Amino acid sequence: MAKLIVSDVDVKDKKVLVRVDFNVPIKDGVIGDDNRIVAALPTIKYIIENGGKAILLSHLGRIKSDEDKKSLSLAPVAKRLGELLEKPVTFVPSNEGKEVEDAINNMKDGDVVVLENTRFQDIDNDFGKRESKNDPKLGEYWASLGDVFVNDAFGTAHRSHASNVGIATAMKAAGKPVAAGFLLEKEIKFLGNAVANPVHPFVTILGGAKVSDKIGVITNLIPKADHIIIGGGMAYTFLKAQGHNIGKSLVEDDKVEFAKELLEKAGDKLVLPIDHVAATEFNNDAASEVVGQDIPDNEMGLDIGPKTIELFKKTLEGAKTVVWNGPMGVFEMPNFAKGTLEVGRALADLPDATTIVGGGDSTAAAKQLGIAPKLTHISTGGGASLEYLEGKELPGIACVSDK
């Protein structure tokens, strides 16, 4: 069933609550990467250009003490949003009470207000984690502030919080519309369709350190994907399951048996490294060498080797849908980043393919290579992307009204 989108709703003269994902890196009040703010602009602009009042809610970081509040205020985010929109944005240093209500009542059509970090509610008022535990009273309070609710925060769609599910539940009970923003719509369209209804050949590239993080994804995708490329630290658990020597490489010994089962279930769908860049130490400056599929006892694999790069490129040839999540090696060390970067290049060069990238290192590689414009979609969710790829229903999407 298709979801209600913000463009399906009349926002003129309406107070529109928007759950955005402004969880950006901030150090000493300076925003390190404003991509998540930029990603929310289409939804915000649509609301204000069509005569609505945009009231924005977001979390930022994890709040465990009053000390955290000093460094995790959304004030710098509101300032940056104003610069990007080229118009004044009102920041309210609270998210409940008279100050909030007065600011909203003073809004004119086309105005934008940013409320303080929703997770401040996790330590305020001695009520326990009101935001993170989805206190229904908090959801009802926030819902009372608006006429329409738009969820545009895919990054928290796998969480059931007061600021997404809580507001949506209360809005629906009051007969008010609950819609997806354009960013959430894009995630549903590309990531959701890639899993539910991919154009074949469908290839998934999975990397990162742990098999345990990707078990659900692999299990869900075995029947759907034509090939599942496995790189990064998680590959060594599979190689050990095949009987290869992996030296001092990262391995999850308690997952070796499970890896064996997956190998049997997947048959030749799983594509594993056939050579490695190995070193004796986990260090960017460590002397390294290319070794075959078996790694010497005193060395550890830190990146895929040149033959593996060619094998993975060949596996990608002709693919029509590709989902990439996770690096092929220790991407944060420049000397062991080549495998990840080469896979990114191969992805960008695929003709007529839907290419979807998720996960921090894969996204960083895409940006480093400057290939982002050539990719169909870069997902804004970490854990949410993985759970979506596992085929799970995400609370932040399920709570949006159907058309």
Swiss-Prot record:
Stored Gene3D superfamilies: Phosphoglycerate kinase, N-terminal domain
GO CC annotations on file: cytosol
Pfam family name, one: PGK
Record-linked InterPro entries: Phosphoglycerate_kinase (IPR001576), Phosphoglycerate_kinase_CS (IPR015911), Phosphoglycerate_kinase_N (IPR015824), Phosphoglycerate_kinase_sf (IPR036043)
PROSITE patterns per record: PGLYCERATE_KINASE
Location in or out of the cell: Cytoplasm
Record-level Gene Ontology MF annotations: ADP binding; ATP binding; phosphoglycerate kinase activity
Description of how the protein assembles with itself and partners: Monomer.
Domain of life of the native organism: Bacteria
Catalytic reactions of this protein: (2R)-3-phosphoglycerate + ATP = (2R)-3-phospho-glyceroyl phosphate + ADP
Family of the protein in this entry: Belongs to the phosphoglycerate kinase family.
Primary residence: cytoplasm
Main EC class the enzyme belongs to: transferase
Protein name: Phosphoglycerate kinase
Record: residues binding ATP: K214, G301, E332, G359, G360, D361, S362
EC number(s) stated in the UniProt entry for this protein: 2.7.2.3
UniProt KW keywords: ATP-binding, Cytoplasm, Glycolysis, Kinase, Nucleotide-binding, Transferase
